[in-house]
């Protein structure tokens, strides 16, 4: 049979166990539900995490002696307090600390006070600095724009100068070619005339030299211009040519424009200068229809006959 003292000891142990469990649960609930009033208390929670449960326990128990705390509950409370302190510390660091030289060309913001506000003096300096930076950027942009416009105008000027130069060179080339072509034609005409003037004497043809041919052609033309009205037979005799050869030479000169005049059906050549020919044409246009007699009479005053008489021309 079990004695009464055994029941007494069991009851005391049971009561002590109940009290221990009750106090442990109260401490855990107090550690979990304690509010954090501000950021400074949360930042310091990691430092006082160890002393806070001890002070709460001393206030609850008063003068009662300390007892052994439950190791598991204490570790959990400390871990929670440290976790809260670390999270709050990261938030504070994120608000107040700026990474140095995150990106080249970005200025550091002004220092933030613990209250999160910027001082008026610091703010004014920051605004002035930003204004100077904006002004520098605007001036730099303006300089770049001026450089771009100047480069564009210079390129346009060079392009225009090149176009004018090419145009001038093309014009000079065309003039040079035209002069060369004119000289070539004149030389060919001269060669034709030179080959045409052949002195035939006693059935023997003798080709003149270049100097003789040129002198002969000049003499031939001057004789006609001086005579104004010349018989083709007399001209051929004077030049030492056959009559048909003289007629052919005159026709060649008329075609080339060296001489101007007419050959009538009586074997005469009448030389008329371009000015006299224009005067006759003007007379015909003014009178309208003109007879041969009227034209012959007008020719006496419009055409200078030289040494020959007008009667010779009309004859």
UniProtKB/Swiss-Prot annotation:
Major location (coarse): endoplasmic reticulum
Disulfide bonding pattern of the chain: none
Membrane topology field: Single-pass membrane protein
GO biological process: cartilage development; negative regulation of apoptotic process; negative regulation of gene expression; negative regulation of IRE1-mediated unfolded protein response; negative regulation of PERK-mediated unfolded protein response; negative regulation of proteasomal ubiquitin-dependent protein catabolic process; positive regulation of canonical NF-kappaB signal transduction; positive regulation of cell migration
Region Disordered, annotated ranges: 30-184
Crosslink position(s): Glycyl lysine isopeptide (Lys-Gly) (interchain with G-Cter in UFM1): 268
Post-translational modification: Ufmylated; conjugated to ubiquitin-like protein UFM1, probably at Lys-268 by UFL1. The relevance of ufmylation is however unclear: as DDRGK1 acts as a substrate adapter for ufmylation, it is uncertain whether ufmylation is a collateral effect of the ufmylation process or whether it is required to regulate its activity.
Highest rank taxon of the organism: Eukaryota
Cytoplasmic topological domain: 29-315
Sequence positions bearing Phosphoserine: 73
Ranges that cross the membrane: 1-28
UniProt keywords, alphabetically: Endoplasmic reticulum, Isopeptide bond, Membrane, Phosphoprotein, Transmembrane, Transmembrane helix, Ubl conjugation, Ubl conjugation pathway
Compositionally biased residues, Basic and acidic residues: 34-43, 125-184
Region listing for Mediates interaction with TRIP4, in residue ranges: 119-217
Functional description taken from the UniProt entry: Component of the UFM1 ribosome E3 ligase (UREL) complex, a multiprotein complex that catalyzes ufmylation of endoplasmic reticulum-docked proteins. The UREL complex plays a key role in ribosome recycling by mediating mono-ufmylation of the RPL26/uL24 subunit of the 60S ribosome following ribosome dissociation: ufmylation weakens the junction between post-termination 60S subunits and SEC61 translocons, promoting release and recycling of the large ribosomal subunit from the endoplasmic reticulum membrane.
PANTHER family referenced in this protein's UniProt entry, alphabetically: DDRGK DOMAIN-CONTAINING PROTEIN 1
Quaternary structure, from the entry: Component of the UFM1 ribosome E3 ligase (UREL) complex, composed of UFL1, DDRGK1 and CDK5RAP3. Interacts with (unphosphorylated) ERN1/IRE1-alpha; interaction is dependent on UFM1 and takes place in response to endoplasmic reticulum stress, regulating ERN1/IRE1-alpha stability. Interacts with NFKBIA. Interacts with SOX9.
Name of the protein in its database record: DDRGK domain-containing protein 1
